[in-house]
């Protein structure tokens, strides 16, 4: 393969000398005796060669290949240098679908639809990266490689980030030969060029491994339903076996000391589960029944459930007549600000600013119009039947200073709530997290790429974001280096499925842990992946009243799952000689890379950036986890609300009397009125008349003047 790529360079030089200005790379010549060079390798290698020899601006690079078929394929080919792409096999497949009457459409119309879908996906990817023209995107190499050797990167994908090493050019050659042999029998006895599904998008027997498969789903549901811990251990045993081949933590193991501690000496299940949270799944994306079941379960455990970005029905903000607390402890604030009035914020124990989403990095939320039923629209303060899309960036955040302002606003809106910022695991997230900590956030959430969202297109889910193991380790280490680790809690999520997963996350720096897909599975989710279509057959991810009748989940199932995870985590802690979760946080020295046979693919992965943390020693442990006394001081006692407005209005507020005052303000008075507005909301919600409290402001108020104030409170300027 290496010689074949070198031959490409020679042929390109010859064509250039002969006066060619367009080079076409084609794999149509594949037959019994000719194996194709992988299209991305060919394009990127030739691009790098032409750039180095200063010929690229004189030549266009066109690819004719049967490989590209999905949005990501086209995006990487363009990003690594292709000028144009002819996906002939994808187009032949469209024709075959029409010929076999599986697609009732004119060929040219069908091809046009296919092209439109691909182009829309490419444009979306470019937009996520802040790029507005395809010319700027071509050759930009804005990717990170996972599992590719440094020599391959340096020679063929120059300057592309690749942090964990991986397969060599020889391994790639072996893969190509294996695929070729499957189509063309080496003995010449049989030729079978039909395409085979690898089960990448949906589970297929004998194809790609999926962590959630019929066996694991059955064991998880039955064990949590019955409260059977031994059956749950069967589930985690299967998961741990599958993880060996599917994610980075599967390549790690614990380095146990000669002597552990007794299980009774380890932090209790009741204490550990308070660190657990459910993921940000909005009311609208999942059903009322599913959303409330999660809240009831987590409140029972003294953990935290998350509203997602869809607001929360006001009837849930107080304990119901049945004595159950359906109020989500975490209230999310996303770029669309759907359903974020003052009462929503004042009812929170934690307010989460969603800067990004692990399951679809670079994109905002999207609730299709068919799922925006009247009751959803009412909660989100929107219009029934109209799709709700959160823009990828927050319209008011373009710097750390802007983020600091929003954090300050939200702290004023609820002085008792922790402020959390959700980030995606990606290269450089540690630097961003350091800025977030300096801006005053009390929790930083690092969200991994393989958290599941059924409400996003596959191009948004696959090949976007990175494993939480990389982002978490980077964030933890960067915060320590900047003297900020003790000021913030670190949380992580992204397909945490077992006590071992959680223990590894703690060793890499996490203090709190989020679960989303697993709790849904315990409530009945069967991974149909039709969440966005409003057709969920088990009533979990639908607003259809008839389908919701099929929901049979119970809080007890989620409670059992969380307690089982904590119990299994305790067992690992006992073997490691660890008494509390705080002792475990950041102890990457307790993790080792598993040993694999020399030359195997697993042996080529380099985990040193994740595991070799110079601060991961017990004696340096003081600043390695959150210290409550070191939390950011917002100096709320010095605000104009605390020093002037609340003292002036205190008696009128207590007696519900109308009152008007006049004050002098300046642009130093940020979030003016927000603290007092929160006091009104806590005491009376929206049950006071308009203009009950009026403040005449002389001068110019600062940023976020009157943010989140209720209707009974008015500022006059």
Predicted features by range, described:
Residues 676, 682-686, 703-709:
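Short, T/G/N/S-enriched strand-turn elements that build extracellular solenoid repeat scaffolds
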Residues 48, 52-92, 96-143, 148-150, ...:
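Phosphate/diphosphate-binding loops
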Residues 1, 74, 105-330, 348, ...:
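Flexible, glycine-rich loop/tail regions that form catalytic "lids" or insertion modules at the edges
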Residues 9-26, 32, 48, 52, ...:
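Alpha/beta enzyme core
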